[in-house]
Swiss-Prot record:
Record gene name: TPS11
Binding positions for Mg(2+) 2 per the UniProt entry: D317, D321
Pfam families membership: Terpene_synth, Terpene_synth_C
Cofactor: Mg(2+)
Domain statement: The Asp-Asp-Xaa-Xaa-Asp/Glu (DDXXD/E) motif is important for the catalytic activity, presumably through binding to Mg(2+).
Miscellaneous: Does not produce any detectable product when tested in vitro.
Job description of the protein: Probable sesquiterpene synthase.
The protein's name in its UniProt record: Probable terpene synthase 11
Source species of the chain: Ricinus communis
Molecular function as annotated in GO: magnesium ion binding; terpene synthase activity
EC number, UniProt record: 4.2.3.-
Binding residue positions for Mg(2+) 1: D317, D321
Amino acid sequence: MSMIGTKSFFISSSPKVPVGISWGPSSYRTNSSLSVRSPTLTCSISTISQPTRKEPATTKPEIMEELHEGTRKELLTSSSPIATMKLIDSIQRLGVGYYFEEEINTLLDRFLDLETTEDLLATALRFRLLRDNCFPAHSDVFGKFMNKDGKFKESLRKDVWGLLSLYEASYLGTKDEVELVEAMEFTKTCLEEQSIPLMAHKLSRHVSQALDLPRHLRMPRLEARNYIHEYSLESNNSPPLLELAKLEFNAVQSLHQKELIEIVRWWKQLGLVDKLGFARDRPLECYLWTVGIFPEPYNSTCRIELTKTIAILLVIDDIFDTYGSLPDLILFTEAVRRWDLNAMESLPEYMKICYMALYNTTNDIGFMILKRHGLSIVPHLKRTWIDMFEAFLTEAKWFNSGYVPTLEEYLDNGVTTGGTYMALVHSFFLMGQGVNKETVTMMEPYPDLFSLSGRILRLWDDLGTAREEQERGDVACSIECLMREKRISCDDEGRKQVRQLIRSLWTELNGELIAPSAMPLSIINASLNLARTAQVVYQHGDDKKGSSVDNQVQALIYIPISFPKRRDLKLL
């Protein structure tokens, strides 16, 4: 079961039933599963088949430069360390941090030697900013707020803003940082006990949002969209920063639309869905994963090329999951191991077109990287696909034999079938930062960073889709494996423990964030963003709240941010 791109972002009351093709039905799955597959997104895609807006006049380079300079000046002349930290936090949450990377790094470097204060909000904010940007930050700075028993002082309960700041910081803790483990439990309890309706509106809004989803776990592009509105309500916001964020969001959204049009054109020309009536037609959903992983404008090629690979992955997943017989799946896997066009001749007709699409798309990416960096990377890309096929085949054999794996067996295999290794290895080469002969060797074996992110993705997918898959008679998922191992009979308890496992995996992932490594920061962030996107996509799947994801998709791809006609700004 591939997870990247598998969940429908749109809910429909009349799902479209794919039409079967003439080749024989699968002995691996029953064709009845096809009838519950989500509808294609042709209607949604058609809404952006033409440009949706004219570029506003305020996107002229001189206006953007004026806004950049105004924000930069304000950042460098801020009145106090806490004001500077708050401004950095806002810049990054608004999605324009890449414009001020040098200035932010210089300022954060100064904060390393900043004397800590008795202000809980400032201490927690400093810790979070440093750690989130891969600067050294030690959790013992919170010791001054704890009593001799290692518990946070009861007097802190009155400082709700400080509690909120500490709560957000605690989500960047590692598994060995007892102060942050205690901080999460203490602040969560305190914030939940507060009477939110009695709080000031601004504070209650922030508390509710944090308890629903802490900042560290949010998808950056979606956070930028939501925070632009929040920031506009702040009485002390920075006018040039706010306008810059709005204009930048709309400009990047327009770029995303153009990329999606290019992807849809490629997908139609490829013709896999026309030839394979059982295959999913979801280029939009595949693209949304890449927006979650790397939304920045300079990663345009990465999004386009990775979307292509994910779209092909979904078709391969459908062959393994719903259509191919076990003997044919063995042939398919062997052909991919050989990786040559002659191997294709032994395949059934419906597999040949998919094999050719995979072969050509992968080699095209390899050629692109060869021209850019002088490195031959096809063997590395090919390896991710071979591993994927072998993991799919393992899952097919489990299903045919009725074998229920242990949770560890399931997760080890599920990270691969979920597409994490394929997606992140491709991303590493496509982003290009730090790609050289030395760093290429870090892709073999797969980094722990990738494995942890992939496990989080796998578990969130199961929480979001397990009930539907159980109805189809799919392979046992992590919830079932865990319940079987621990002899749990209550489904809700099984789900609770899976969520606890996800939280534990995040502490390990945070450990990778601060561990000394030659891994480029771009791929570290991509790994974190993959896990974040999984939570956004799947966290409400078991609660039947898919419409909330639908709204998020509309906000990210289709609906620009509107604002009053621009007036001259007083730039500080």
